[in-house]
């Protein structure tokens, strides 16, 4: 039980070689481009619930994953690349594109928080590589993501109260986001276990 709840892992993995402090330049570029593409693909799986101002997407799976697998800097760069692509190509949820999207989308704050959420996850998971550690790292990234997203939503949607913004921008997504975090943590922990460094 103690080992299960431990944040730090003493076991190295081949997967750790993908992070910026260890990866070759070509592998770093591939990782950044790959997670930018995964984030774009996640936006295509978008569901809008009636009267909900923020769509449900799979993007945060890639946001959290980019921090875990690539580290803070490259996770941030992957999400910046995704946002940059969206200025010219319709890769945002709902086929949104361009600077005008940010001016009119109530959910744009979440997008702007992606790079920073990935960086937080990457920074914390540099040492916290266990199932519990990666989960805590993603919870911290999620807290930042929703803080920025809800704040943007409050002013963009002109809500009468902060409680309305918190309800519509966070509380409705808590269970969904926790499920995503657990899924990514299980995959990350499982992959690290499958590829120990001594077998690489």
Segments predicted by a language model, with ranges:
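Alpha-helical membrane segments and adjacent membrane-interface helices in multi-pass membrane proteins
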Residues: 45-119
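Alpha-helical transmembrane segments and their cytosolic interface
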Residues: 1-33, 167-200
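Membrane-embedded alpha-helical hairpins and interfacial helices in multi-pass inner-membrane proteins
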Residues: 52, 96, 128-199
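Structural signal for the C-terminal ends of transmembrane alpha-helices
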Residues: 69-73, 120-128, 190-195
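Mid-bilayer segments of alpha-helical transmembrane spans in multi-pass integral membrane proteins
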Residues: 88, 106-115, 119, 123, ...
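Hydrophobic alpha-helical transmembrane segments
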Residues: 29-33, 61-65, 76-80, 107-112, ...
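Aromatic-anchored segments of alpha-helical transmembrane domains
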Residues: 36-44, 83-93, 142-150
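Hydrophobic transmembrane alpha-helices
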Residues: 2-76
């Amino acid at each position: 039980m103690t080992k299960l709840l431990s944040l730090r892992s003493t076991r190295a993995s081949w997967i750790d070689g993908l992070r910026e402090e260890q990866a070759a330049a070509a592998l770093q570029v591939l990782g950044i481009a790959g997670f930018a593409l995964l984030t774009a693909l996640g936006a295509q799986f978008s569901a809008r619930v009636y009267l909900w101002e923020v769509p449900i997407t799979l993007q945060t799976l890639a946001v959290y994953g980019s921090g875990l697998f690539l580290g803070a800097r490259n996770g941030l760069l992957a999400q910046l690349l995704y946002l940059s692509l969206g200025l010219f190509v319709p890769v945002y949820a709902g086929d949104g594109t361009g600077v005008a999207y940010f001016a009119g989308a109530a959910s744009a704050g979440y997008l702007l928080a992606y790079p920073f959420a990935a960086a937080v996850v990457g920074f914390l998971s540099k040492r916290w590589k266990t199932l519990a550690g990666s989960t805590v790292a993603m919870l911290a990234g999620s807290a930042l993501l929703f803080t920025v997203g809800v704040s943007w939503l409050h002013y963009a949607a002109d809500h009468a109260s902060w409680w309305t913004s918190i309800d519509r921008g966070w509380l409705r997504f808590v269970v969904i986001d926790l499920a995503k975090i657990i899924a990514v943590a299980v995959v990350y922990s499982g992959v690290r276990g499958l590829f120990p460094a001594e077998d690489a």
